[in-house]
């Protein structure tokens, strides 16, 4: 009986976590009045550059580059700074 409950909970949570990225809302990264593109002159890949832009305020966010524009997800975790 306990094993059945644990199994049901495991399947429910793993399914929820697996589908989480699909339901996540993505927001375009904006600077001024424009939408920021992923291309850069720093020699970084588009995904790395987009990640750097989305996380510049010290908060963990998912990021993605879609159609050469940068999109940021909602805040995940605060960064922990080790001294």
UniProtKB/Swiss-Prot annotation:
Coiled-coil spans in chain: none
Signal peptide: 1-18
Keyword set, alphabetical order: Disulfide bond, Ion channel impairing toxin, Neurotoxin, Potassium channel impairing toxin, Secreted, Signal, Toxin, Voltage-gated potassium channel impairing toxin
PTM annotation: Contains 3 disulfide bonds.
Tissue: Expressed by the venom gland.
Location of the protein in the cell: Secreted
GO MF annotations, alphabetized: potassium channel regulator activity; toxin activity
Biological role stated in the UniProt entry: Reversibly inhibits potassium channels.
Name of the protein in its database record: Putative potassium channel toxin Ts20
């Amino acid at each position: 009986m306990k094993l059945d409950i644990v199994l049901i909970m495991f399947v429910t949570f793993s399914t929820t976590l697996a589908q989480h990225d699909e339901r996540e809302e993505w927001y375009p990264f904006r600077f001024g009045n424009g939408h920021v593109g992923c291309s850069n002159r720093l020699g970084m890949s588009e995904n790395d550059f987009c990640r750097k832009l989305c996380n510049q305020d010290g908060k963990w966010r998912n990021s993605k580059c879609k159609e050469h524009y940068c999109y940021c997800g909602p805040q995940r975790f605060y960064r922990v700074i080790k001294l």
